[in-house]
């Protein structure tokens, strides 16, 4: 069951999903990981936020763009720094590679902004 401490991780790369989930679980967050936006939709409704890797934008461009805009500011897009994305409107970005502290900083700012 999802609660306010659950974070959804969406990435095609299993290693990235595991790494992000591990970093969050060490800090006391619950995580659910998915390899596609469609599989994560139902879980995201009650989650604290969603973390989406930018590779999903290449494999599911329309679904991922809609997914990010529907999170109401509760999404983080992981970008590789070379991605030519338009400036985010409804989500935060975090450039890869990043540290656990970087990730937690972005999550904390989303939580503060949501209050």
From Swiss-Prot:
Keywords: Plasmid, Repressor, Transcription, Transcription regulation. The keyword Transcription applies. The keyword Transcription regulation applies. It comes from the Bacteria. Interacts directly with FixL. Prevents transcription of the intermediate key regulatory genes nifA and fixK by counteracting the activity of the FixLJ two-component system. Acts as an inhibitor of the sensor hemoprotein kinase fixL, preventing the production or the accumulation of its phosphorylated form. This is Transcriptional regulator protein FixT. The gene is fixT.
């Amino acid at each position: 069951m999802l609660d306010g401490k659950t974070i959804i991780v969406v990435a095609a790369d299993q290693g990235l999903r595991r790494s992000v989930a591990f970093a969050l679980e060490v800090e006391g967050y619950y995580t659910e990981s998915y390899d596609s936006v469609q599989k994560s939709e139902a879980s995201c409704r009650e989650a604290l936020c969603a973390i989406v890797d930018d590779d999903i934008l290449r494999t599911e461009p329309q679904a991922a763009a809609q997914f990010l805009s529907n999170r109401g500011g509760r999404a983080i897009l992981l970008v590789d720094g070379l991605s030519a994305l338009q400036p985010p409107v409804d989500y935060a970005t975090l450039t890869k590679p990043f540290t656990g502290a970087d990730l937690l900083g972005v999550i904390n700012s989303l939580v503060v902004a949501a209050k």
